[in-house]
Each structure stands twice: as structure tokens, then as C-alpha cells.
Amino acid sequence: MNKKMTEQEGIRHQKIEELKKLKTEPFGKNFTCSHTIENIILNYQNIDQEWFEENKVNVKIAGRIILKRGQGKAGFLHLQDFNFKIQVYLRSDLLGDAFLLYQNCDLGDIVGIKGFLFKTKTKELTIKALDFIHLTKSLKPLPDKFHGLQNREEMRKKRYLDLMVNEKSRQVFLTRSLIIKSIRNFFDNEGFLEVETPILQPSLGGASAKPFITSHNALNSDFYLRIATELPLKKLIVGGMPKVYEIGRIFRNEGMDATHNPEFSTIEAYQAYSDIQGMMELTQKCLQYICQTVLKSLEINYQNKKISFQTFQKISMTDAIKKETGIDFQKKLSQETCLQLAKQHDINVMSHFSQGHIIEVFFEKYVEHKLIQPTFIYGHPLEISPLAKKNLNNPRFTDRFELFIAGKEFVNAFSELNDPIEQEKRFLNQLKQKELGDDEACEMDYDFLDALSYGMPPTGGLGMGIDRIVMLLTDTPNIRDVILFPHFKNKNIIKKK
């Protein structure tokens, strides 16, 4: 703990000794509440004072002091639990010696109150205190509600303070919990089985991403933190589980911006005997369920944009590009022609780029940011979809879709490739891509190929980013504001030379 104290912190430290003189433990013990502040507000807020005069409601609550006013023999406190606050009225003649504890308390202290409910002349629901129990001394003053913690980075680093003083943040994380609960309820109700698969993986697969690498001492081997849950979940489909899903953390050792964080949460789900169409229907149904459950509406506002989940649009990737640029990539163009088109449109072509990669970059540059309403983009090039089935009508493309909302990707799904011979060829091509400089290419996963060799039924699968769903439904523009503890460079760690 930093030994340099402010004047206020020094005074608070002195009060520890004052509490001990009053035979009060500064950091308290257990305290059993009869109600939460939320219970009291929701159940008694709209009741008149006349009712309280005829019906005495005794309460025993605990909370953090966020306001203190009054002098002499009476005063008021505002106590706050996570999301609700209530006024407390305290008088020396009712509290006796406990009134000294009230007089010595500071903002931020955690206390218990025993008393009964009444309404003030201004009709504010209030507890008249009969006992004041000190529970925890706060050794640092709370940030000023209006002037403190204005720096966004500081709020993210000290989320505990942000939650104390910022109602918006509290609502975001309550909503996040509701969203995850609604996702779980949806898939449970659809007959999916929730499973858990390893975070540490011996091989890299299931997505195109740079991994975090760690060492397993007991096995004397390097492992990856998973970049997706796809391959182990599909092994469970091979094993006979017809519908599975997993909600969990994914790790990708890549850049950070307003919509990307290296550690993030996803839901992945796989259904035997389904396909791309089944996944589209499941995705739309799931998002509509989440919106209705959490917001009670299919219409939302996100960053001054009105978005409706009533209907979902659908367009192929090549048609979307043609609409914006006039270029028809559905036609079979030569690599030289594609490279020339990329040059004409100021698209940087990397050494490993195939036609499929060029098509993807055209989409990202000219189409993606314009997809505001929920839109399924389907028909991705084969080269960028190593785990998806080829489209039967045009094998240059796959039965894959991504869902875009507000200009960002939210869902990735496809008819899963279940041909082990074709999958091995795709993995070999990924290795060639890696040799050409694609550090996000998949590795060869022999155990997954072995599983496919026993036969995986035709399967549909989807992956959805939970953090982005939370951003969307809470009207939050930065992913770091929907993650409780985002990462920061630790300036206190001294690196070994």
C-alpha cells in the first residue's frame, strides 16, 4: 500500500484508533440484513405516509455511505447498495452511544442500520434509525461524483470506483449479466447441451488469429490459449451429442480498439443435421429473444442510429461489393486482374493474398461500415473459410455467413465441413498460407481430422461475440466499457533484463 497519504487519508487512518476506543472493530464482522435496499425501494416507494403510521415496517440493511448531512443532534445519510440508495434519518435520542459512530463516519464507510420506514414531508422514503452499526472503514475518500473519475482510462483501471459512483456503468454490467443469462436460457430451451472444453489447446485452430502461447510444465509442451471453441465442440458432435454450446473466454494476441479486446467472451453452438439456413434462423431467433427478454423491444437505439430486429436482410458478399463498386467478383477473374483491381482501389495486397483475400478486403473497405440494420452476408470465398463447406452451385465460395449490425460483425456461421479428406487439404493450404506470411492461418490438427474420419453428421455451427451484443444493447461505443477489468500495461512490473 502506498505510504504517501493525503491529509484526508491521514484523518481516516486516525479514526481507526477512535473506533477501537469506542470498542468497535474498524473492519467489522458479519451482518444479517432483513431486506436489501432494492427490496425496500421496489416494495414501498409508492406507499403513503398514512399507511406507515398504521403499519410499522422494521428493516435491517447495510450499505455504503454516499451522502452525509446535518449537524448537532440529528442528521441524514444516503446508503447505497449496488444499484439502489435510500435515505436514513438519525437522532441522538434514538441512537444513544451509537450516535458517536454516526458522527465519526465518513463518506465511503460501510454501515448497518436497524430502524423502521416512514415518509418525510417531501414524501421521500426514509429509514428512521434505531441502531447504527459500523462495518467497514473506508481509508480513502470517494471520488467526487461530478468531478472525479472523468478520465475514461482511469475509470476502466479502477472499475471498483467506477461502479461506486457511475450509475451508467452499473446498468451496463447488470445488463451484461441479463444478456448472458438470456443466451443460456435460449439455447437451453432449444434443447442444446451446455459443455466446457479446454482453454489450453495443443494446436491452433477454429479461427484465423494470432495466439497467446504458454508452457505446460508437467507435459513439457507448449500450449495455446484457445482462439475459438469450434474444433472440440465439433468433436462432441462426432461423439453423438446432437446439440451443444459453450459460453466462454477466447484469447487472441492481436490489436486493441473500440471493438476488439484480446480476451473476450463468445457463445458457440453446433447442431447436427443442420446447415447455413438453420443457423440463420437460429441466429435471428436468438437475437430477437435476447432483445425481448432484456429490453422488452425489438427496436433499439445505438449511437444515434435506430436499429430494428423485426427483420433481417440477406445479401451475398459478392453482390454487396458489386452494389458499392460495380465490380463483379462472382465472375471468375484471374489473379492478375484481381491484383490490378486492388491497386486501382488503393488496397494493400499482402504476400499471401489469394483472390478470396482480395474479395474480403474489398468487402471490409466498401461494404461493412454501411451495414447498419441486421444483415446476413453469405457466400464467403473458399480461401478465407477453411472449416466451411463449399457451395454446391459455385465451389469457389462457401456456405458461410456473417451477421453485421451497426457496421460491425456479430456472428460467424456456416455449414460445417465434415469431409476429412477435404479438411486435410484445407489445413495443408493453411500451412502454405502461413509460409507465405499469414501468421493467422490455422495449423494442422490431426486429432480433429481423426475425429472427422469416424464420421460427423451434416452440421451447422455459429459463433457470436457476447461483448459486442452488450455494447449494442447498452448503447456503449467502446468494448472496454462492457468488460469489467480490461487489460492495461502494468507500469509497476519491472521486466527482467
UniProtKB/Swiss-Prot annotation:
Record field: catalytic activity: tRNA(Lys) + L-lysine + ATP = L-lysyl-tRNA(Lys) + AMP + diphosphate
Record's signal peptide: none
Positions of Mg(2+) 2 binding: 409
Gene3D superfamilies found in the cross-reference section: Bira Bifunctional Protein, Domain 2, Nucleic acid-binding proteins
Cofactor dependence: Mg(2+)
Cofactor: how and how many bound: Binds 3 Mg(2+) ions per subunit.
Keyword annotations: Aminoacyl-tRNA synthetase, ATP-binding, Cytoplasm, Ligase, Magnesium, Metal-binding, Nucleotide-binding, Protein biosynthesis
Biological-process GO terms, alphabetical: lysyl-tRNA aminoacylation
Residues holding Mg(2+) 1: 402, 409
GO terms under cellular component: cytosol
Pfam families hit by this protein: tRNA-synt_2, tRNA_anti-codon
Coiled-coil blocks: none
Annotated compartments: Cytoplasm
Chief localisation class: cytoplasm
PROSITE patterns, per the entry: AA_TRNA_LIGASE_II (PS50862)
EC number(s) from the headed UniProt entry: 6.1.1.6
InterPro entries per UniProt: Aa-tRNA-synt_II (IPR004364), aa-tRNA-synth_II (IPR006195), aa-tRNA-synth_II/BPL/LPL (IPR045864), Lys-tRNA-ligase_II (IPR002313), Lys-tRNA-ligase_II_N (IPR044136), Lys-tRNA-synth_II_C (IPR018149), NA-bd_OB-fold (IPR012340), NA-bd_OB_tRNA (IPR004365)
GO molecular function, one term: lysine-tRNA ligase activity
Enzyme class: ligase
NCBIfam families, A to Z: lysS_bact, PRK00484.1
Subunit composition and interactions: Homodimer.
Family classification: Belongs to the class-II aminoacyl-tRNA synthetase family.
HAMAP family: Lys_tRNA_synth_class2 (MF_00252)
Protein name: Lysine--tRNA ligase
Organism: Phytoplasma australiense
Top-level taxonomy: Bacteria, Bacillati, Mycoplasmatota, Mollicutes, Acholeplasmatales
